[in-house]
């Protein structure tokens, strides 16, 4: 219109109105409704799971019924600036200790790993958490949250879990005072449970629980400021259930811990003659 009205060239007309010349040749791309809905899904996913990247977004999209491949999700994820901020890498310690494969379970309820984790409420008071996972299924069996937890508290958690799942064959933990206490030793002896103590200063020997701890802190503890012990217990228990039900693991063929455990038990049920 400007060219015809004022008799100027295409270059002059575009420069005057600040419009790229390419817009005169290529029609604007119409975004299909399906792609727009997919982008909305990815944006909502990134807000709900701020520490999960495009790979997990692609897996979740397919679990929710989207017919998409990784390449497309990656393109849209980066196009809309949904990248997860890179974490600073810590220097890894090296040492000699028990190889993690020396005791790798081949079925559920063989080996439970235990460890403590700490945080605070907004008033600065300590939150102490006892995390328990099944190393085979990767299920988080418990995250027990208190201000303090002693050996008797550990025994109470083990009693509760054994009542639901039965006692394990082994417990793996470090040499913390709560774990080496006589109360825990008595519980293990009474329930015929063996103990595996990792070497002092060797957290990599308890690799699965350390991996869980890292994800737990990255995906929840670093994002929340708890107002009270009660609030912490409610939110952390919700996270534990969500982790078991909705977090796929590559080692399990992208099944969640609960799905993997259910699948294993179904496939290994005694056959009725």
Residue ranges: model-predicted function:
Residues 1-273:
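Charged DNA-binding/catalytic regions of mobile-element recombinases
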């Amino acid at each position: 219109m400007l060219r015809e009205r004022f008799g100027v060239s295409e270059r002059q007309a575009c420069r005057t109105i600040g419009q790229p010349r390419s817009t005169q040749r290529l029609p604007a791309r119409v975004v299909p409704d399906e792609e727009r809905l997919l982008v909305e899904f990815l944006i909502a996913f990134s807000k709900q799971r701020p520490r999960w990247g495009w790979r997990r977004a692609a897996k979740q999209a397919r679990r929710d019924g989207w017919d998409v491949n990784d390449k497309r999700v990656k393109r849209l994820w980066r196009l809309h600036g949904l990248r997860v901020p890179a974490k600073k890498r810590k220097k890894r310690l090296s040492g000699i200790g028990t190889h993690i494969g020396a005791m790798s379970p081949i079925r559920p309820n063989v080996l439970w790993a235990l460890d403590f984790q700490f945080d605070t409420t907004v008033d600065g008071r300590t939150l102490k958490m006892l995390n328990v996972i099944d190393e085979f299924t990767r299920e988080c069996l418990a995250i027990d949250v208190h201000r303090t937890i002693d050996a008797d508290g550990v025994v109470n958690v083990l009693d509760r879990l054994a009542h639901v799942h039965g006692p394990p064959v082994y417990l793996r933990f470090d040499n913390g005072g709560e774990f080496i206490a006589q109360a825990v030793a008595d519980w293990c002896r009474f329930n015929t449970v063996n103990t595996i103590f990792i070497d002092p200063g060797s957290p990599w020997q308890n690799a699965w629980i350390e991996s869980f701890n890292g994800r737990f802190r990255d995906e929840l503890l670093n994002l929340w400021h708890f107002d009270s012990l009660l609030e912490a217990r409610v939110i952390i228990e919700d996270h534990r259930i969500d982790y078991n039900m909705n977090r796929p693991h590559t080692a399990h063929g992208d099944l969640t811990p609960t799905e993997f455990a259910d699948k294993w038990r179904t496939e290994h049920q005694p056959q009725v003659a």
